[in-house]
Curated annotation (Swiss-Prot):
GO terms for biological process: nitrogen fixation. This is FeMo cofactor biosynthesis protein NifB. Residues 49-298 form the Radical SAM core domain. Coiled coil: none annotated. InterPro entries: Aldolase_TIM (IPR013785), Di-Nase_FeMo-co_biosynth (IPR003731), DiNase_FeMo-co_biosyn_sf (IPR036105), MoaA_NifB_PqqE_Fe-S-bd_CS (IPR000385), Nase_CF_NifB (IPR005980), NifB_C (IPR034165), rSAM (IPR007197). Binds 3 [4Fe-4S] clusters per monomer. One cluster is coordinated with 3 cysteines and an exchangeable S-adenosyl-L-methionine. The two others probably act as substrate. GO terms for molecular function: 4 iron, 4 sulfur cluster binding; lyase activity; metal ion binding. It holds the Pfam family Radical_SAM. S-adenosyl-L-methionine binds at residues 69, 117, 169, 221.
Length: 499
């Protein structure tokens, strides 16, 4: 297996200046070996997240560091963030749950161990779980997430366990900044604090990343954007991890509310705005691609990104299930998914051919309501998030997410809720939906956002490019004037998602 940095797919394109590896890379952008490893991984491939599911098993409760943005909870069903689970599992319970989920959700292709503590602070449970899953379900990709403190000690064990993807959370490479994020670490049977703790942590993280890259393990770097603490500094983090062979960089917004009980939440540290996050992601994109579709999942998440079906697979429910692992059924289902993906790409490319050469300076941002499968298949009133696409003569580029409060509640909508949604997508020219009622449609039009429902249940890329083609045509004919919709200064209470 080659080291990651030897693959030409992880270098910047001479034509575009953008990296051709990472979450937005397609079949033609990557070496065949790398493509086969990421094509059905919903975190490492942006397109795959429309079609494939993942699951996390909560077998790693202990942690060896304290983060000011984290508060682990082991019996919590109503918070959607990392470090939270409804129940802890033994390795034996975990593998039974994996089989149950894989049987029920044949597009589930990835198992991750992401807490609620740190996977490598619980090595016996973590690697026993991975071994049991490899034996019972050999087609499932294995992942783990770690803060990196113990990583150098377990790199060879990770390779032997056939873990192909590792996520490392790296929030700084400057110990003075790190001291503001981490109160303490526990290393070599001793607790360290302050700058000394942060120095040990960053050295271990970067050492572990280099070791994994040399062994061909695909590494995703998670970084939490904390305004006025590490926001400007994350550009340096990006350079450091890129030079050490990281495959993908995921800059996530700080989740900071008092009810979560984190240090940052309790002291009023704000999270970034949507525009602040996108500006930073754009600044870092180039030699490495940025992951923009992260949902900051719970440590027991199950299903497609953006949905959580973990309540269907509690330990009590799984124990009652009569499960049989049908590998051939899973292969057949996933083959149908791949055929669908090929059709989707072909449809988008055909539509894009009609836009070539048309007013290349125009770019517009649109919001899409989708439940997955790469389709415009969600009702405006039921949408809990909108996916954002930047449209240009180069195509439809996924650039982020906006989480919203559902407009429809118990069969009715409220005007104040609509105003909040419109505020959250105020920089978009249009919103694509499967269906929309008269009241929200009228409100959106008044706000200058075009509601588009004529492409219901059609492919996102094909439909948005078709709309863009018509939009550019109207501009050329003088029927409308193109105006870039800007984002006003930060509004109190702005909410964003990690993409």
């Amino acid at each position: 297996m080659q080291s990651i940095t030897e693959h030409k797919g992880c270098r910047a394109s001479a034509k575009t200046g953008r990296a051709s590896c990472g979450s937005q890379a397609g079949r033609g952008d990557l070496p065949v070996e790398i493509w086969e490893r990421v094509k059905n991984h919903p975190c490492y491939s942006e397109d795959a997240h429309h079609h494939y599911a993942r699951m996390h098993v909560a077998v790693a409760p202990a942690c060896n560091i304290q983060c000011n943005y984290c508060n682990r909870k082991y019996d919590c069903a109503n918070e959607s963030r990392p470090g939270v689970v409804s129940e802890k599992l033994t390795p034996e319970q975990a593998v039974r749950k994996v089989i149950a989920v894989a049987t029920t959700i044949p597009q589930m292709t990835v198992l991750g161990i992401a807490g609620p503590g740190d996977a490598l602070a619980n090595p016996a449970k973590t690697f026993k779980t991975l071994a049991l899953v490899t034996e019972a379900a050999p087609d499932i990709k294995l992942c783990l997430s770690t803060n990196g403190l113990a990583l150098p000690d377990y790199v060879d064990t990770i390779v032997r366990a056939k873990v192909d993807h590792v996520t490392i959370t790296i929030n700084m490479v400057d110990p003075e900044i790190g001291a503001k994020i981490y109160p303490w670490i526990f290393f070599n049977h001793k607790r360290y604090t302050g700058i000394e703790a942060a120095r040990i942590l960053t050295n271990r993280q970067l050492q572990g990343l280099e070791m994994l890259s040399e062994r061909g393990i695909l590494c995703k770097i998670n970084s939490v954007m904390i305004p006025n603490i590490n926001d400007d500094h994350l550009v340096e983090v990006n350079k450091a991890v890129t030079s050490r062979g990281a495959f993908l960089h995921n800059i996530m917004p700080l989740i900071s509310v008092p009810e979560h009980g984190t240090a940052f939440g309790l002291n009023g540290q704000r999270g970034p705005t949507a525009q602040e996050l996108k500006t930073l992601q754009d600044a870092c994109e180039g030699k490495i691609n940025m992951m923009r579709h992260c949902r900051q999942c719970r440590a027991d998440a199950v299903g497609l990104l953006g949905e959580d079906r973990s309540a269907e697979f509690t330990n009590d429910q799984v124990m009652k299930m009569d499960v049989h692992y049908d590998l051939e059924m899973r292969k057949a289902y996933q083959k149908r998914v791949e055929n669908e993906r090929v059709s989707k790409v072909a449809a988008g490319q055909k539509e894009l051919a009609g836009v070539s050469g048309e007013m290349s300076a125009i770019t517009v941002l649109v919001a899409v309501a989708t439940k997955g499968s790469g389709l415009i298949n969600e009702h405006f009133g039921h949408a809990k998030e909108f996916q954002l696409y930047e449209l240009s003569t180069s195509g439809a580029k996924f650039v982020g997410l906006r989480r919203v409060e559902g407009y429809c509640q118990a069969g009715y909508g409220e005007e104040d809720r609509l105003s909040v949604i419109m505020r959250d997508i105020r920089d978009c020219h249009a919103v694509f939906v499967a269906k929309i009622g008269g009241c929200p449609k009228s409100g959106l039009i008044k706000a200058g956002i075009e509601p588009v429902d004529q492409f219901a249940y059609e492919y996102i890329e094909k439909s948005t490019i078709a709309w863009f083609r018509a939009y550019v045509g109207k501009v050329k004919r003088g029927e409308i004037q193109h105006v870039q919709r800007g984002v006003p200064p930060r509004w109190p209470g702005d909410r964003i998602s990690a993409a």
